[in-house]
Amino acid sequence: MRRLPSVIAVTPLRRPLPRLACLLALAFAPVLQAAAPVALEREVNTFIGSKDDGNTFPGASAPFGLIQVSPIGEHYAGWRYDDPKIRGFGHSFLSGAGCWEQGGQVSVLPVTGSIGKGGDFNTDDAKSFDHKRYASPYTHDGEIGQAGYYKVRLTGYGGIDAEATARTRAAAERYTFSVDAGTGHVLVNVGQANERHSVIGSVIDVVGDRVVEGKLVTKSFCGGHQYTTWFRLEFDRPFKAFGTWGEEGGLAGARHRMEGEQKPSGAWLSFDTGKNRTVTAISAISHVDAEGARNNLRSEGMQGGKLLGFEQMRSQSQQQWRRELATTRVQGGTPDDRTVFYSALYHALLQPLTGSDADGRYRGYDDAIHRADGWTYYEYFSLWDTYRAQNQWLALTRPQVARDIGRSLLAINEQGGWLPRWGYANFETNIMTGDPVTPFLVDLWRFGALAGREGEAYTALRRNAFEQPPLNSRHAGRSGNPGYVDNGYVAYDRAFPSKGMDVDPHHGGSATLEYALADCALAQMADGLGHADDASTLRARGGNWHKVWDPQVRDEETGMSGFPRPRMDDGKWYVPSDGHYSPRSHHGFHEGTAWQYQWLAQQDVPGLVQAMHGREQAGKRLDAFFAYDALVQSPLTAARKEWVVGPYSYYNQYRYNPNNEPDLHAPWMYTLIGQPWKTATVVRAAQQLFTNAPNGVTGNDDLGTMSAWYLFSAIGLYPAVPGSGQFLLHTPRFTQVEVDLGTGRTLTLAADGADGRTLQYVQGVRVDGKDHAPVWLDWTRLQQGGRIDFALAAQAPTRGWGTQVDALPRSFCATPGAVLE
C-alpha cells in the first residue's frame, strides 16, 4: 500500500559529513579506496522517508538485521519526523511498509522521577505506565541518523541523551541522564508497541540485578495472524531497584508479570546515576524461543562472557555498513546527490530481515522450528513491491543474499504448503494482489540464484500458476485461477470471499494483467529448463492482457480509445451503476486506474503498441500520461505539479503515479517503443522527488522498493521486463558509478559531464570500448563486469541511438503477427 508526502520539501537536514570533507573525498576517491574505506555510513541520512508517509524508521539496524532500535511516536509505522514526542524505543521495525499493525515491540524509555504510590509514576494507577502518557518531548537539535547509529536528545525528565546501534541479531542502547538526576529509571513496556499494533499477550521477568526478558504476542500487518517475539535485555551494571506493572498498577520488587490482550504490562529498573550518568543495555530478540534471544545476545552482544560496550557495538555495526555501502562507489553529483544515493542504497539493504537465530534455527510457516545450516533464512517479503526493482538490485550486487532469499522462499513453500505473496514473520498475510512471487523467483533463476534448486522452484511455481491452495490453507495464492485458466481473465467480483484484506477477484482487471506478466516470466523459465509444452501454454497466457483490453473504451478528455477494463464472470464487460465506464475510475484495479495499469504489458510491446494504434499514437499516449511537454519546459519542478501527488490518490487519475508500484517501469516504455530520449526526460523529472529531506522518498519506500528504483535510475540501468534478464540503458545521474557484483567483478558506468540538474540524453553507448547500438544489455553480459560509457548530449537525438526497431529488445510474449514499425 502506498503513501505520498503531502509536503513538497523541508529544509535539508545537516549533512552527515561537512561539505568540504565530501568534496575532498570525491577529489581523492582513488587514494581513499586504496588506503581505507571512506566513512560512507555517515553519508547516509536515515531521516529520509520519515516524514509524511515514507514510513521509514530513523533508528539503528544492520544490513538485513533481525533487530532494529528506533523511536516510537504517533504513527503506525513507528515514528514521523514531526511527531511531538517519543513514547519509547522499539526493537522491531519494517522500512517503508504501508499496513498498520507492524513493529515497535519492547518499548523502552529512560525516565526520571518517583515511582511508587502517588509518585510521578503512580503504582496505584496503571495509566501512569501508558507510554502515550509518559512519552518524552525531544529536540531535532543534535539528532543523528547514520547507518548503524542513532542519537536523540530527550528534553523531558531533565534531559536525557539516547543512543542506539545494532548488529544483525543484537543491539545496544546507551542512555545518559542529566548531572542532577541522582536516580534514572528504564521502563520496559511489553504491553504496547507501535500505534495500532495490538499486543495480544505478554510476559516479562526480571532476572537477577542486570537482566529483563520475556515475550509478547502481537497481531500483524492489516489484521494478519498472531506471532510471538521473545526478547532479552542485559545491562552493563546492576539496577538498585525494580518492579513490574500490570492491569492493577505497579508493584515494587515484583519480578514477574503476565497480562492479556491490550493490557498494561512491563517492568521498571532503577539505577544510581549520581556518579555514573550512563546506562547501557544490550538487547536481542528472536522469533524462535527464549533461548534464541539469549543466544543471539551472547553471540553478537558479548565477548568472552562479558557484554560488549556501546562503542564496540557501534564500531562493528558501522564498519559492516561501511563495507556494504562501499560496494557501490559514485563520482560526481552534489553532496546532496551523494547522500540521497547512499541513503537509497542503505534503505534497499534493510530487507528482507534475517529470520534465523545465531544457531541457525528459525520458525517456519508450519510453526515448527527448523535450522538453516550454512545459510541465512530470511523473512518479511513484500513481493508485490520488491519484485519490480529491489529483488534485481540484490541479485545483481549480492548474489549470496539472493541465493539465500530464494532458498527461504522455497522453504516457505515446503513448510507452509504454498509460495508466499506478502510473508510477515512466519505466515502469509495475503496482502496485495496478482502473482508477484513468480516474476520474483524467475528473476532469481535468471540471475543464477536458484542454481541447484531450479527443479524444485519450477515445480512450486507451476503449481502456483495452474492451481489454488486448499481452503484450509492460510495462503490465497492465485485465487482467480479457476476462471483465469479456463477463460484467460480474472472475473471482477467484489463479493469474492477473502482470506485476508486483499483477494484477486476484488481487482479482476489488474489481477489479470499481473497474472499475464507472471505467466510470461514463467514461460521463459519453462523454456530454459526444457518444459516445451508448459512454455508454449504459458507464453500464450502471457498475452492474456488482451482479454481485458476493451478497444471501445474512450477517455473523454483526451479522446484516446482502447483501455483495460474488468470483465464479469459471464464474460461481459463491467458496467458501473451510472452506465458509463471511465478508464480513470477505480473499478477493478488495485491501487490504480486503467490509465496507469495499461502499461503493465511490457512483456508484449508489439501487441500493446498495436492495440494503441501504432508507435506514434502510443508515444502520444505516453506524452499525455507523463505531461511530457511540461517536463521538458520545467524538468526540476513539473513532476510535483503534473503527476499524482496525493498520499491516497490511487483512483480517478490518468497521470503517472511515481508513488506506487504499478507504474515503476512506465518511464522505460518510451525506450521500448524507440523513444529513449523521452525516458531520460521522465527519469530526470522523477529523480527530483528524491531529496535529502525527511519527505525525500516517493510514497511508502515499501521495504526498499522505491530506493532500489532510484538506484537503478541513477546508475543508468533498469530491469523493466520481469524474467527477461534485460536491463534497459538510460542517462546516468553521476559521472561514474562502480558497482561490485559480489563475484570479484566490477561493473563501471561512466557518463562524462552527467549533471542531475539538467536534461541530458544518450547520444551513444560503448561497452568495453566498442560501440553498442541496442538500448539494453542482458544479465549474462552484465555479470561479466566491465565498463559502459554513455556519451551525453543536451539536445534530444530523436533519430539517433536507440530509435531503430533493431535496437530494441525482443518481447518474449509478443502477440503473433504484431510488429513494431
Question: Which positions does each model-derived feature cover?
Answer:
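Hydrophobic, small-residue-rich alpha-helical packing segments that form membrane-like cores
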Residues: E514-A518
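Bacterial N-terminal signal peptides that target proteins for export
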Residues: R3-A21
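Accessory carbohydrate-recognition regions in carbohydrate-active enzymes
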Residues: A34-N391, A395-P439, W445-L513, Q524-K547, ...
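Bacterial N-terminal signal peptides
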Residues: R19-P30
